Every structure is written in C-alpha cells, then in structure tokens.
Amino acid sequence: MKRDDAWAGLLDADEKVIWQGQPDSGIKPTLSMIGNAGVGLFFAFMGLRGLFQSYSDSGPHGNSLLIFSGFGLIFAGYHVLAPGFLRRYTWYMLTDRRAFIAENVPFCGLTTTSYPITSETVIELEEGTPPSVIFASENKSFARMFFIDRGPSNSEIGFEYIADARHVLKLMRDIQKGGA
C-alpha cells in the first residue's frame, strides 16, 4: 500500500495535510509483553520438563506434552513479535483538524480511523525510544475471567513510536490554538 492510498477520499475539501508518518516497527518491551511472554515460556518449559521426565521414567509416553511447549512458545512469540508486525502496516496522518490512523494488515484489509483535534483534546507526549504522541483514549470492557470481574480498561490512542514526536506535538498544539 502506498501512503497516500489510505487517505484517498477521507479529507474534506478545504482540509490540508500537515504531517504524515509511520511508527517504528521494532520490538518495544512493555510490562504486559514481558508478563505474557513469561507465561508462555513457563508453559513451554513445563511441557519440555514433563516430556524429559516421562522419557526417563517409562519411555516415550510423554509426546503429548509437546503440545504445551508448542502453545507456550507460540504464545510468547506472539506477544513479543505481533505489536511490531502490526506497526509495520500502520500509517499516520495529521491534517489541520484531524488525526488519522490507517492500518492495512495482510489478510485483514484496510481500516482508517480519524480523531478530531479540538481545544478540549488532551494531548500528551509519552517518552520512549522513540516517543509517542497520545491524543485519545478508548474504554475497553473485559469479560469476567476466573470469576473475577476485571472491569473496564482504558486504552491510549495516538501516534506511537514516531521519531519526530516533539514536532508533531507542536503541530497539534498549533491546531488547538487555531494556527495550523
């Protein structure tokens, strides 16, 4: 997908593009990523441990334990590699009144979401390597898990892991002041 294809037909007649970019697609460790990868590696280790123990006890009857190792490794690998893979297919655009996020993940199709930038929009810089500009949030409701109601969770939305985040933050502040 070319960068401009995602934006075709989305802009108002008098709306102008002031910035376009794409996030860094490298691996960015987060607490949830480390925790989920740890759970996956635990299952992989326990499956392999059971497999080797069954071989030493009574012969090759523990091959069914390989499935636990496989699922554990897949679970860990997914949580480490998937976020960077998804960012590789993400594009950002800032106009004089809206922020757009487009994703064109293979086999999933193109999705484009816009967020208005008004004087009431809370915009913040999230430090990192590279930093992110957060400008919206979304409440996600989680189902009950293990008889515990986990309640709603707030998910931050923005231009994640962009090298020129400080410049984009300044552009967004200018939009809020009406000077874009």
Mark where each language-model region is.
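A membrane-cytosol interface segment of integral membrane proteins
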Residues: 127-180
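Short, charged cytosolic
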Residues: 1-21
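Membrane-proximal intrinsically disordered regions of secretory-pathway and membrane-system proteins
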Residues: 11, 15-18, 110-111, 116-125, ...
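A generic secondary-structure signal marking the coil-to-beta-strand transition
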Residues: 15-17, 90, 131
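Conserved beta-hairpin
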Residues: 19, 75-116
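Acidic, Ser/Thr-rich low-complexity segments on the non-lumenal side of membrane proteins
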Residues: 98, 102-143
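Alpha-helical transmembrane spans
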Residues: 26-91
